């Protein structure tokens, strides 16, 4: 299996970091960039040198995906999870972090521990317990979002951070799907309490599990993404069931999925979704991480969150590329885009334990703002734009995307968001404004 250029660069930078003496390295790369393939490739190289590698993850679906990736690069391995008897004898083991934590006393020390979804790593967590049980092992953490729920970085467990490509770079190169973001409504969260860094689930359920909000989600799905495969991210299992029921009542093939289902039932629902027999899948967190189905074209956000990591993980489920897929539609009924910014917005991650992101200066991109037109798209405010034609009375970058092509002034008038210029490419971001003050054509 051939690596993409950015994957090869990231792998080399990880190896260089270890050679420089760092014992615990964090690799940051977007959802959909092929992180599993990258660390499987690293595992293959070490396995050829008879090194012991343990790859830990926290969900059954992740264990399966990791095993599939290892098979693709011809790595012999075993799986350690609930129901597994004894300790695997292969040099490479894919382990449930919770099962491994219970068997640490008898588990042989690995040379390398690889942690998928490493934003869960904290010293006092199960992940931290496993890592600290083997002080001589090197550690490679992999994540798209190197930030804890409380906004702090992962510097207490990692020595160095290797930055992979950005979402914007991969979108520009055609490795991720461009996204259109629509925010038809923003929920009133003034009464929602906060606990442990995020909204209290019971308060969110009371706010979001309403016919008016779900009805709006169904209506906008019909208008903007009718018939496309969608994932709806919900607040609770009850909320997910209610949302699925409303989509079914509207004539769509929908189903919910949750961790309480047995393995056979969950696999059956996912198989139907993959084949298109189910159009809309509703879930409470179960598919926020490690869910790999590139054919998903729509993300319906019905779960407000203060967690940037959770928001990016959810939005990232829908931006993988797939044959015939031209774009991703994000229907944000939760206000997450306005709170956290666009999925491909540049983020300056840092490893320090104080704050995982550098604070923006006044000259950097302000928060997302709603469009003033009827389209209900979301825009990102910018401080200055130098358009190819016309002058701006106030500048905006629209989240609509159009095929790269020349557009005349009379064509611009037909758009719900008036535009000033287009960055040409397979798909370009439209630089839009409220008022175009010059009549020059493009």
Locate each region found by the language model.
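Walker A/P-loop
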Residues: 20-43, 233, 257, 282
């Amino acid at each position: 299996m051939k690596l993409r250029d950015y994957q090869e660069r990231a792998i080399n930078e990880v190896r260089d970091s270890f050679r420089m003496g760092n014992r615990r390295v964090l690799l940051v790369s977007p959802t959909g960039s092929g992180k599993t393939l990258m660390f499987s490739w690293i595992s293959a190289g070490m396995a050829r040198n008879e090194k012991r590698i343990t790859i830990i993850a926290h969900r059954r679906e992740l264990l399966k995906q990791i095993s599939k990736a290892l098979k693709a690069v011809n790595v012999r391995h075993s799986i350690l999870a609930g129901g597994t008897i004894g300790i695997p004898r292969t040099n490479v083991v894919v382990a449930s972090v919770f099962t491994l934590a219970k068997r640490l006393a008898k588990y042989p020390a690995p040379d390398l521990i690889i942690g998928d979804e490493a934003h869960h790593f904290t010293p006092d967590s199960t992940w931290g317990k496993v890592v600290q049980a083997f002080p001589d092992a090197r550690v490679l953490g992999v994540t798209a979002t190197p930030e804890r729920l409380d906004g702090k970085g992962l510097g207490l467990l990692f020595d160095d951070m290797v930055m992979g490509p950005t979402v914007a770079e991969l979108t520009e190169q055609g490795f991720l799907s461009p996204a259109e973001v629509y925010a038809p409504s923003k929920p009133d969260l003034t009464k929602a309490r906060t606990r442990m860094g995020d909204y209290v689930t019971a308060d969110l359920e009371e706010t979001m599990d309403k016919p008016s909000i779900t009805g709006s989600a169904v209506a906008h799905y019909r208008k903007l993404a009718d018939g496309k495969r969608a994932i709806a991210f919900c607040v609770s299992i009850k909320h997910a069931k209610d949302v699925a029921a409303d989509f079914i009542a509207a004539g769509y093939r929908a189903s919910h999925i949750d961790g309480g289902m047995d393995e056979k039932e969950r696999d059956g629902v996912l198989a139907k979704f993959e084949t298109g027999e189910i159009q809309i899948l509703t879930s409470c967190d179960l598919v926020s991480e490690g869910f790999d189905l590139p054919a998903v074209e729509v993300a319906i956000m019905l779960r407000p969150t203060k967690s940037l990591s959770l928001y990016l993980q959810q939005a990232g489920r829908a931006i993988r590329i797939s044959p015939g897929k031209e774009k991703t539609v994000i229907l944000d009924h939760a206000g997450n885009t306005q709170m956290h910014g666009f999925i491909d917005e540049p983020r300056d991650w840092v490893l320090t334990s104080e704050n995982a992101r550098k604070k923006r200066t006044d000259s950097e991109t302000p928060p997302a703002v709603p469009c003033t037109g009827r389209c209900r798209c979301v825009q990102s405010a910018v401080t200055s734009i130098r358009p190819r034609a016309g002058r701006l009375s106030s500048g905006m970058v629209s989240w609509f995307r159009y095929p790269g092509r020349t557009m005349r002034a009379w064509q611009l008038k037909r758009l719900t968001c008036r535009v000033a210029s287009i960055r040409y490419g397979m798909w370009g971001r439209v630089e839009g404004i409220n008022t175009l003050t010059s009549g020059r054509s493009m």
